[in-house]
Structures are given as structure tokens and as C-alpha cells.
């Protein structure tokens, strides 16, 4: 096996791409735009929880899903994205693409967006990059506002509708992500969000605190209250973690919640006994 970045090549020629999850170190909503999207800014960081994507030559395009969070991907953005990329480039992509879904679905961890970015980036490189970076960003954002971030990963400030990305210095942290086994709908959470928000911190203050490595003291998620109103499991998880002395933060529009550091074995067992998933991760 050889490895280049997140691409592995197996002995039989099957390509394997590692598509990382992300967490939001805060999500601030500035208001709603005329086009229906929200203006936001957020600090996002990739973590070492991965979907594995297997790609090999095939007689036609086929996208399959396996793993603990597999589902029918015929209408998934990876399938639709490859078809659209094929139309734009005039190339047929006769590949069998198998996505091993290890990242929980509807968790606020960006799994589908990361998968899309990984596959389209790979296909673009196979064609010797007919799409330059901005074109690729625009293409990906037409499917998912999170997807452009995954072209580079690491740590970034995302703003606008989430499609504008400013790369930041990585933040080294151990975190534990807990998925309460409920698939939250991003559109449903954003659609239910009606509150007028006041920015507790200015963007300049957030960036300054990041430079001081003080990430824990800036995190705020304007969607958390709305998500809890829709999905009671998120609130139950947050209250449980608070009751045992941890400071939990919701990622994205939910449903996953994370804490900095590791949980005790006793707490992990208590969470898993409820059917919830616990992942010990590091930022990457």
C-alpha cells in the first residue's frame, strides 16, 4: 500500500480516500438573506474520524454505501455530484464508488459534504485539474455549503452562507464526540431558527482569542436552542454531560455534541448503554 495525502492505493488497484469529519468550534448567525439562506460565521476543524471511500473501474457509475451508517446513496449528493461533474467535463466516470460510512449521518459532522469533496477532488485530479480552485469551490457549494471547506480541511473560518473559507492555523486538541443516535435535519433546524441574535463577540475578538489558543472561551452555537426544541435527545445528552462535570458543545446544526479531552470509562459506558456513540478524536 502506498499513501499520498488522504489517498491510499491497495495492491489490486482499488483507490481508497479518507474523508474526515469536522466539528464547529462555534456557530454564529448574523441574519437571514433574501435568498433564504442565513449569513453565518463559524470556526471549523477537521478531526480524525473518517469515512473510507473505495474507488475502482467499473462498467458504469455505481455508488454504494456500507458500514454502520450506510443508507441508499442513489439520491445522495455524491452520486448527483459525480453526474453533474460528468456533464460539465464531458467525461464518463465509469467507477464503482463504495462509501464506508463511519461518520454518523445527520450529526453536524459534515460526513456527506466531506465525501462529496473527496470524490470530486479525486476525479478532478484524474483529469489533470480542469476545474481550478474557485470553480471547484463554486461547484461544490451548489450541492453543500460545507463542502468547499473540505478541499483543504484543517482549521478555517467559514462565513457568508458557509461557502466562503479563510484558512486558519490548526488548533491541537483532543475531543470526544458523542452522537445521540438521532439524525438531525440541517434544513429543519435552520428553518425553525427565528431568533434575533446578538453577536456576543466580534469576529476580530474571536480571531484574537484563537491566536491566544483560547478556543474554549469563545464557543457559542446560535442553533443549539432550536435544535434541542426539535430533537429532545440533544438536550438530554447535553444535560447528562453537564451533570457529570463536562462542558458540552453542539457541532453544527446537531445532533452530535462534543467535549474537550476524554471521558472516563464509566461515563462512556453510561452513554453507550443508551445506544449513543462515543468517539475519541483529535483535531487534524
Curated annotation (Swiss-Prot):
> Which keywords fit this entry according to its UniProt record?
ATP-binding, Isoprene biosynthesis, Kinase, Nucleotide-binding, Transferase
Q: In which pathway does it act?
A: Isoprenoid biosynthesis; isopentenyl diphosphate biosynthesis via DXP pathway; isopentenyl diphosphate from 1-deoxy-D-xylulose 5-phosphate: step 3/6
Q: Active-site positions, per UniProt?
A: 22, 146
The question of whether ATP-binding is a record keyword is answered with yes
Question: Gene3D superfamilies this protein is in?
Answer: 3.30.230.10, GHMP kinase, C-terminal domain
A GO BP term, please? Answer: isopentenyl diphosphate biosynthetic process, methylerythritol 4-phosphate pathway
Q: Which InterPro entries match?
A: GHMP_kinase_C_dom (IPR013750), GHMP_kinase_C_sf (IPR036554), GHMP_kinase_N_dom (IPR006204), IspE (IPR004424), Ribosomal_Su5_D2-typ_SF (IPR020568), Ribsml_uS5_D2-typ_fold_subgr (IPR014721)
Could you state a single Gene Ontology molecular function term?
Answer: ATP binding
Using the UniProt record, name the top-level EC class of this enzyme in a single word.
transferase
* Record-listed E.C. numbers: 2.7.1.148
Question: Which reaction is the catalytic activity of this chain?
Answer: 4-CDP-2-C-methyl-D-erythritol + ATP = 4-CDP-2-C-methyl-D-erythritol 2-phosphate + ADP + H(+)
Superkingdom of origin: Bacteria
- Cite the binding residues for ATP: 104-114
PANTHER family linked to this entry: 4-DIPHOSPHOCYTIDYL-2-C-METHYL-D-ERYTHRITOL KINASE, CHLOROPLASTIC
Under the heading HAMAP family, the entry gives: IspE
As for family, the record states:
Belongs to the GHMP kinase family. IspE subfamily.
Function description: Catalyzes the phosphorylation of the position 2 hydroxy group of 4-diphosphocytidyl-2C-methyl-D-erythritol.
The name on file for this protein is 4-diphosphocytidyl-2-C-methyl-D-erythritol kinase
Amino acid at each position: 500500500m502506498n499513501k499520498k495525502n488522504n489517498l491510499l492505493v491497495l495492491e489490486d488497484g482499488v483507490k481508497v480516500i479518507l474523508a474526515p469529519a469536522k466539528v464547529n468550534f462555534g456557530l454564529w448567525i448574523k441574519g437571514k438573506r433574501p435568498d433564504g439562506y442565513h449569513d453565518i460565521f463559524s470556526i471549523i476543524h477537521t478531526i480524525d474520524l473518517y469515512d473510507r471511500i473505495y474507488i475502482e473501474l467499473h462498467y458504469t457509475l455505481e455508488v454504494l454505501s456500507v458500514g454502520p451508517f450506510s443508507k441508499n446513496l442513489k439520491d445522495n449528493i455524491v452520486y448527483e455530484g459525480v453526474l453533474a461533474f460528468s456533464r460539465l467535463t464531458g467525461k464518463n466516470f465509469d467507477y464503482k464508488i463504495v462509501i464506508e460510512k463511519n461518520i454518523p449521518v445527520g450529526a453536524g459532522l459534515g460526513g456527506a459534504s466531506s465525501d462529496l469533496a473527496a470524490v470530486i477532488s479525486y476525479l478532478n485530479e484524474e483529469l489533470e485539474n480542469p476545474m481550478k480552485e474557485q470553480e471547484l469551490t463554486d461547484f461544490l457549494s451548489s450541492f453543500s455549503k460545507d463542502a468547499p471547506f473540505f478541499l483543504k480541511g484543517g482549521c478555517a473560518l467559514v462565513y457568508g452562507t458557509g461557502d466562503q473559507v479563510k484558512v486558519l492555523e490548526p488548533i491541537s486538541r483532543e475531543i470526544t464526540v458523542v452522537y445521540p443516535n438521532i439524525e438531525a435535519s440541517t434544513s429543519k433546524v435552520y428553518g425553525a431558527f427565528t431568533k434575533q441574535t446578538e453577536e456576543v463577540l466580534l469576529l476580530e475578538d474571536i480571531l484574537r482569542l484563537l491566536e491566544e489558543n483560547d478556543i474554549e472561551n469563545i464557543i457559542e452555537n446560535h442553533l443549539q436552542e432550536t435544535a434541542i426544541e426539535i430533537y429532545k435527545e440533544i438536550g438530554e445528552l447535553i444535560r447528562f454531560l453537564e451533570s457529570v462535570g463536562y462542558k458540552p458543545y453542539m457541532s453544527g446544526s446537531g445532533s452530535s455534541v462534543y467535549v474537550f479531552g476524554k471521558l472516563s470509562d464509566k461515563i462512556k459506558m453510561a452513554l453507550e448503554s443508551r445506544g449513543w456513540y462515543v468517539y475519541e478524536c483529535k483535531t487534524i
